[in-house]
Structure formats: C-alpha cells, structure tokens
C-alpha cells in the first residue's frame, strides 16, 4: 500500500479535546476501508533543537467513509496529535492505508462498546451495520462528557457512562453490560476495558470482536512492536476475536512500547 497525499477538506465534531478531519487525495483512495481498519498518518513537524525536521507517523482508526473522502477523529494525546489538531482545511497529510483486519458485519442485534478514542471506529461500524438492517445498541464511555466523541451521530440506541458523572451513568462503561443479550459484542478502547469486555462475553456466551490499541511504529508488520503473542496487531488485527484473545498469554498483561520495550501491566 503506497502512501498518498490527502488534503484536509473539512473539520467537524469539535470538542475541547479534539475534532474530526475529512481527507481527500487528489487521485482518490486506493481501496475502500472496512470498519475497524486504520491508516498511518505522517506529519512533518518543525526542526528539533538539533536542527532536524521531525516526521512522525501515527495509526488512526477510520471514523467514516464517503466516496472520495475518509474521516479521522483526533484527540490531543501528545506532540503528534497536537500538531495534527493544529492543521486546517487545505493542509496536506501523508496517509497510508487502509491497513489491518476489521470487524465482521453480520450481526443483527449488535452491542457496541467504545471507551475514549475507541468511539470513532465504532461509529463507522454502527453506520455499516445499520445500513445492513442491524439494530445497534452503543455504549460510550469517557472521563468527562466532553471526551465522548460522536455521541449524537450513532444510529440506534446510545447510552453514556462518564468517570465524573457529567453525562449519563456515573461510573465505568462496563457497568452498562449487565442484562444485555446481543448476538455479538464489538468493542474498542483501553485494554483494561477490553479485558472486562472479553470476560463478560465469555461468561455470557456472546461472540465478541475487540479492536486493540497498541503502540505501532510502521503499521505494516516490519517493526514488530505491536506484537501480541505471535500475532501482529497491525496485520492480524487490530480486530481480534474473543476466541483468539481467550487463548492469549499477553492480552491485558504485556504491552510493547517504543523500541520494543516490554512492560507488564498490573493484573
């Protein structure tokens, strides 16, 4: 998959912590994305103290698709995302993708659960499921109400949970799982949340597909830092099945950071 230069045509979904871009390349996208797939976005930043220009590439899940243009949602999480949020319509980004393995689209009574920046790829998924006759129910969680992206754009029923109680249920998003009986659970967000989602799915006999957020440097399987067990999240994922993750020795326990440094997460 070759990188393409894509122009920012529109900015929408503005919040205090981020917003969305619509991107259009001059010659069109090489391939239509599927929900759950991602792109690598490269951005050149001003020279460092050593006088060298910095070029960062970050993975970003696809939040929407229309013929000729693709949507990404960015949250301020560090220097690269802050630089992306400073871009304006007419600016150009270098984009590679779509990449990875996405969600299936066969559920009729799907339950979607997104935490933080896990909401954008689920918006794309919910729209695709609804277009196929599904009746999605979506659970969205965040630290505050202002950190819940796309809350008014999801088709079907939407329920909210916030850490501070500023919107919806005051507590964890996983508190909202009780009493549900979907034919499939789809989830994206922080790994501790996904661990709880997996446990609920296995305990209730609900097939699940979880979209992992792992550190990636290349997005094409060369660097290996997104490895989980023997799988590469950038190629075998980012969406992995509950059957696969139930057998994992590393899910929820081990992550790899920049340079491949292994970090064990609290149980």
Language model feature labels by segment:
Residues 10, 64, 160-162, 210, ...:
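Structural signal for conserved beta-strand scaffold positions within catalytic alpha/beta enzyme cores
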Residues 1-89:
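Ferredoxin-reductase
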């Amino acid at each position: 998959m070759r990188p393409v230069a894509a122009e920012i045509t529109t900015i929408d979904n503005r919040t205090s912590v981020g917003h969305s871009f619509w991107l259009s390349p001059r010659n069109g996208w090489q391939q239509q994305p599927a929900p759950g797939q991602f792109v690598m976005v490269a951005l050149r930043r001003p020279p460092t103290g050593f006088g060298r220009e910095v070029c960062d590439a970050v993975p970003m899940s696809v939040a929407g698709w229309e013929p000729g243009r693709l949507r990404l949602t960015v949250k301020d999480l560090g220097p690269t995302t802050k630089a992306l949020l400073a871009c304006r319509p007419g600016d150009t980004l270098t984009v590679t993708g779509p990449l990875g393995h996405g969600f299936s689209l066969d559920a009729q009574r799907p339950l979607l659960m997104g935490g933080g920046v896990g909401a954008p790829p689920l918006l794309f998924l919910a729209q695709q499921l609804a277009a196929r006759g599904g009746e999605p129910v979506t659970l969205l969680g965040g630290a505050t109400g202002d950190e819940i992206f796309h809350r008014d754009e999801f088709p079907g029923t939407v329920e909210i949970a916030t850490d501070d109680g500023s919107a919806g249920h005051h507590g964890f998003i996983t508190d909202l799982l009780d009493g549900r009986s979907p034919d499939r659970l789809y989830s994206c967000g922080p790994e501790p949340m996904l661990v709880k989602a997996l446990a609920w799915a296995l305990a209730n006999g609900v097939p699940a597909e979880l979209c992992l957020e792992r550190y990636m440097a290349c997005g094409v399987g060369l660097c290996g830092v997104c490895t989980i067990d023997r799988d590469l999240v950038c190629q075998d994922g980012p969406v992995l099945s509950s059957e696969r993750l139930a057998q994992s020795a590393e899910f929820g326990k081990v992550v790899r950071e920049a340079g491949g440094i292994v970090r064990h997460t609290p149980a």
